[in-house]
Amino acid sequence: MNTVIAFILIFGTLVFFHELGHLILAQRAGILCREFAIGFGPKIFSFKKNETVYTIRLLPIGGFVRMAGEDPEMIEVKPGYTVGLLFDSENKVEKIIINQKEKYPDALVIEVEQADLEHQMRITGYEHGNEDHLSSFSVSETSFFIVDGEEVQIAPYNRQFHSKTVWQRIKAIAAGPIMNFILAYVILVMLGLMQGVPSDEPVLGKLIDNGRAAEAGLQEGDRIQTINGENMRSWTDIVNTVREHPEKELKIVLMRDNVKLTKYVTPEAVKAGDETVGRFGAYNPVKTGVLTSISYGATETATVAQSIVTNLGKLVTGQFSIDMLAGPVGIYDMTDQVAKTGVINLLKLAAFLSINLGIVNLLPIPALDGGRLLFLFIEAIRGKPINREKEAFVVFIGVAFLMLLMLVVTWNDIQRLFL
């Protein structure tokens, strides 16, 4: 599979489901979601469904759901502004025309005296030609601004993010990472159904034709008891022992059809990174079945998550170097290497990256979902929200930190791969 396509498909899928989690829970809470975006930068494709514009942007390195009220509204109607009003069948303001009013001859033009488009949903002003009479108009809950011919939905306060309960906001933010864990689980269950679930029993699975194990007379189903006199209690024991003995003869005692046999195998020496290890051309056995696959999906998701959390802890304590982190360039190279081995391994990589994305997003760093959740938990404990300006300042610092970290990691990737 072409590496670029594989990278875009994997990364795009992970981002899509992450942002979909945010979108679904936000919409359930009644929050107006203005945009659901995959990628950053200029739009290359977009369409609108119901209240939300769905876009694909040029740089496939993330995504976002733009919820009303998270940022200051871009369009304001202040006293002294001249706007045009269009009405619905209930005589409520349906559209407020900000500019190019000449294109809407049916609009009632007023000079605004007062406008409350969040709580009271009313706009008051003087009609052109009747400046002595102040008129007040009720504004529909589903009204729009029209700016440069484009409609922008007005967000009453009850449709804004900060109007919702702390619990509703926590669910909307946490849903993104949770969706990544669910996606990884589903992928792993699919892999279990497609190829079986790897077993850690000390039993041989399929053998590679002309591999060292096959040449030595070993067969699928052989239960390994000892290697060089050491008891083999699991497949992991077998792998570790074989890895440690490249091109060194091993005495293997096994059971086959209730008969004890002794075989001699010399593992092939192969390069694995900077070291040489032994392999003997045998796979571990697999178990099949729906329940087995469901269980495997859960345990493997938990195992991978635990491993990632452990490594993050080592990063904090200095046991794990920042040079070992991979950014977009490193992930692209990883995708290139894995793509050469087939679709199954690409799916495994996608599951790993999905879990990784979920965990990283839960880190309590401002600008990440975890940082936003931290603010919400503090609000729940205090009983009142954190000052918006202070929160914005902390988020700015978080964004700067993440940008710096991304630059460092990307530079490390480039040095490691190309220099």
From Swiss-Prot:
Membrane topology: Multi-pass membrane protein
Keyword Transferase: no
Catalytic residue positions: E19
One of the record's GO molecular function terms: metal ion binding
GO terms under cellular component: plasma membrane
Domain PDZ: 184-269
Localization of this protein: Cell membrane
Role this protein plays: Is responsible for Site-2 cleavage of the RsiW anti-sigma factor. This results, after a third proteolytic step catalyzed by the ClpXP protease, in the release of SigW and the transcription activation of the genes under the control of the sigma-W factor.
Name the record gives this protein: Zinc metalloprotease RasP
Species this protein is from: Bacillus licheniformis (strain ATCC 14580 / DSM 13 / JCM 2505 / CCUG 7422 / NBRC 12200 / NCIMB 9375 / NCTC 10341 / NRRL NRS-1264 / Gibson 46)
Gene this chain is encoded by: rasP
